[in-house]
Each structure stands twice: as structure tokens, then as C-alpha cells.
């Protein structure tokens, strides 16, 4: 008998009616859970607040150091959200224990978001404890829910819990440390968390999780990921509206408003017009749903979300200082955000259809080349150029897809 079998035998000593005590917390087989539930949507509101906190922190002081810290926070926020989404994909979110879990995670999430702007100052420990509480408590709940369910899934969550417990020690130790060491320890914590799925949460003595152990609903994960993109775009709209109102008397604000709104709409179009549905179809139809979902959503959506957040910060700069000559610091957000976004959507479309969207390659190339113009043009011109380049990408892809469909017909 393998070591893993011994662990399973120890954790499943009883059969019969007791199995029903916890397995009814799980999503029922053959149940259509494609649509996000109301408890999940309610949970997402915490991340609206968290993204606003992050965006405003960046807008207040966009130095290279602050930008690096923001990248760390984007990795952390995305990881805690996508892990929660995976767990909710397996559980029945309409029953009370699972709803109570979501409400508990919401509370920890609010505390985490409150601490976020000062996480590298006086609130590091609060941020670390709240983040770790979300990760570990959710994983322990899933472990308990699967205790009388599928043994392979139970062991997968046993491994995940072990990995998240290790990463939490780095988070909390970092929260107790001085800022320079805190950065290092929190980076180590994120490396641990992001490495886990790639090595299938290998644990000494019991090894790695078998492939495709979790009975996930790929279409549900696709919708949830798309909703997070909507959250990020919504935060962008809030930023545009707030800072347009704050700068109404500044000459050039109406033009920057138009180009900022155009940029945001085009990001929506590039993601949703074709790519999101293709990703959902791929996740639903593949013979390897768990692996495909990791490529498309767990890792693939991170640059999409990060790109939208940085684009919002760049739009804020352009609205606040439309006629100021560009700087490379600001351009990291103004041009780097759309580059990240296009890279992420290109990856998603490549994985889901095995066709490389050359329009995205062209757009990334133009945006990268635009860095050479930064010191010579004003912020509003950089914003306008970004909007025009994304428009070219969107029109190119639209025409190319229309041609492909005609050819296929």
C-alpha cells in the first residue's frame, strides 16, 4: 500500500450515512453551475475596494519602488481571488456553510484591503495575517468538505493546505520584519504559492497530486475570470470619472477623457468580442480541464488584470497632467499597462485556439516602440496614441476573424 493510500485510509475510516454530512457541501455531479452565484458576486465586491486602494496608492506616488510593490500586490490579490474561485467551483455556494465561508473570507479581505496602502509601512503584519487567513482557512474548509468525498481531491487539498501554510509563515514573518526584508520574504511567499500548481503541490513522503484530480467546471471558471476582468475595467471607469471631475478646470481634460474612455472600451472589446468565449469553450471541451484552466485562467489572466490596473493609473496621470511632457516612470503605466493586457489576451487566445493573433503582436510592437517618443510628447498625446494603437488592434482582429468565418463557411 502506498503512503498516500495510508493517509487516505486514516482519513476515511467510516462509510455510509456519515459521508453525507460533508459531501452535500460539494457541487452536485452533472449540475449546471456555469453562472456565478449571488454569494460569489457579493464576495467580489471586496476586490473592487482592494483594486481601488491599489490604484489610488499608485496614483499618489508612482516611483519604480512603488510600482514594484504594486506588482507584488497584484500577484497576491489575484492569487487569493483565483484560488477562492477554484474552491467555489467545487462547492455548492447556495448552502449555508459555504456562504458563511465566503462571508468570513470577505471580512478578511476587507481588512487586507484596508491595510494594503500601508502594508510596507505600519500595517504589514495586518495585511499578512488577513491574507494568510484567507488562504489557509479556505483551504482547510475545502479539506474538511472533501473528507468524506473523493479521496484524491481530499489529498490534493491536503497538499495545497501544506503549501499555503508554508507560504503563510513567510507572509507573517515578513509582516513582522523591517520593510526591506519584508519585500524579500513576501516575494518568497509568492514564489512558493505560484510554484505549487506547477509541481502539483509535491509533499515529502506522499509525493505530488495526480493530474486532473479536481472535477472542475471550466465554463464556470471562465465566467468568473471574465467577471474579474469586468471588476478591473469597472475600477478603470471609476478612476476616469473621479479624476475627470477633479480636473474639470484643466485645459485638455475633455480630450484625455475621450481617449481614456476609448482605451477602456477597446480593452473590453479585445477581451470579450472573441477571446473570452473561445477560452470558455476550450475549458469546457478539453480532455484536461484542470491543466487547461491553469493555463487559461490561473496564470493566463494575471497579465490581463495587471495590465488593466496599470492602464487605469496611466489614465489618471494623463488626466492630472495632460500637457506635461511624458516621463518613463509614467509611461510604464501608460504604455506598459496596455502591453501587459495585450500579452495576456494574446496568450489566452493562443492557448484556446492555437492561432497566434498577429494583431496583438503588432500592437505590442507599436506600444513598445512608442517608448522612444515619451520624453518629447505630452501625456495627453501618449494617451491618444495608446487609444489609436488599441483601435488598430481591435479593427485588425475584427476584420481577420470576419474573413476567417467567411472562408470557413
UniProtKB/Swiss-Prot annotation:
InterPro entries: Low_temperature_requirement_A
One GO CC term on file: plasma membrane
Keyword Transmembrane part of the UniProt annotation: yes
Domain of life assignment: Bacteria
Transmembrane segments: 62-82, 100-120, 123-143, 152-172, 183-203, 252-272, 293-313, 328-348, 355-375, 376-396
Membrane topology reported for the UniProt record: Multi-pass membrane protein
Pfam families reported in the protein's UniProt record: LtrA
Keywords annotated in UniProt: Cell membrane, Membrane, Plasmid, Transmembrane, Transmembrane helix
Cellular localisation: Cell membrane
PANTHER family: BLL5714 PROTEIN
Protein name: Uncharacterized protein RA0937
Organism: Rhizobium meliloti (strain 1021) (Ensifer meliloti)
Amino acid at each position: 500500500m502506498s503512503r498516500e493510500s495510508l493517509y487516505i485510509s486514516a482519513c476515511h475510516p467510516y462509510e455510509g450515512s456519515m459521508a453525507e454530512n460533508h459531501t452535500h457541501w460539494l457541487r452536485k455531479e452533472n449540475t449546471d453551475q456555469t453562472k456565478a452565484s449571488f454569494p460569489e458576486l457579493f464576495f467580489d465586491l471586496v476586490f473592487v475596494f482592494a483594486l481601488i486602494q491599489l490604484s489610488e496608492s499608485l496614483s499618489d506616488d508612482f516611483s519604480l519602488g512603488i510600482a514594484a510593490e504594486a506588482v507584488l500586490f497584484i500577484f497576491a490579490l489575484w492569487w487569493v481571488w483565483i484560488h477562492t474561485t477554484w474552491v467555489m467551483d467545487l462547492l455548492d455556494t447556495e448552502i449555508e456553510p459555504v456562504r458563511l465561508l465566503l462571508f468570513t473570507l470577505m471580512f478578511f479581505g476587507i481588512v487586507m484591503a484596508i491595510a494594503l496602502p500601508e502594508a510596507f509601512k505600519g500595517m504589514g503584519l495586518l495585511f499578512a495575517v488577513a491574507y494568510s487567513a484567507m488562504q489557509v482557512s479556505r483551504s482547510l474548509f475545502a479539506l474538511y468538505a472533501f473528507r468524506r468525498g473523493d479521496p484524491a481531491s481530499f489529498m490534493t487539498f491536503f497538499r495545497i493546505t501544506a503549501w499555503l501554510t508554508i507560504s503563510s509563515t513567510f507572509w507573517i514573518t515578513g509582516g513582522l520584519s523591517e520593510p526591506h526584508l519584508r519585500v524579500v520574504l513576501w516575494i518568497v511567499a509568492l514564489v512558493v504559492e505560484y510554484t505549487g500548481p506547477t509541481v502539483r503541490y509535491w509533499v515529502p513522503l506522499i509525493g505530488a497530486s495526480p493530474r486532473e484530480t479536481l472535477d472542475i467546471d471550466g465554463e464556470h471558471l471562465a465566467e468568473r475570470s471574465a467577471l474579474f476582468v469586468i471588476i478591473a475595467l469597472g475600477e478603470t471607469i471609476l478612476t476616469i470619472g473621479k479624476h475627470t471631475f477633479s480636473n474639470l478646470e484643466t485645459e485638455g481634460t475633455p480630450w484625455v477623457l475621450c481617449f481614456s474612455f476609448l482605451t477602456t472600451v477597446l480593452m473590453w472589446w479585445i477581451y470579450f468580442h472573441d477571446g473570452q468565449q473561445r477560452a470558455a469553450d476550450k475549458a469546457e471541451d478539453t480532455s484536461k480541464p484542470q491543466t487547461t484552466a491553469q493555463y487559461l485562467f490561473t496564470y493566463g489572466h494575471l497579465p490581463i488584470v495587471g495590465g488593466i490596473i496599470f492602464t487605469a493609473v496611466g489614465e489618471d496621470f494623463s488626466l492630472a497632467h495632460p500637457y506635461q511632457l511624458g516621463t518613463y516612470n509614467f509611461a510604464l503605466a501608460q504604455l506598459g499597462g496596455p502591453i501587459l493586457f495585450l500579452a495576456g489576451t494574446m496568450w489566452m487566445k493562443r492557448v484556446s485556439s492555437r492561432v497566434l493573433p498577429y494583431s496583438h503582436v503588432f500592437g505590442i510592437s507599436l506600444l513598445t516602440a512608442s517608448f522612444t517618443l515619451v520624453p518629447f510628447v505630452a501625456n495627453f498625446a501618449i494617451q491618444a496614441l495608446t487609444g489609436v494603437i488599441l483601435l488598430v488592434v481591435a479593427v485588425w482582429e475584427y476584420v481577420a476573424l470576419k474573413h476567417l468565418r467567411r472562408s470557413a463557411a
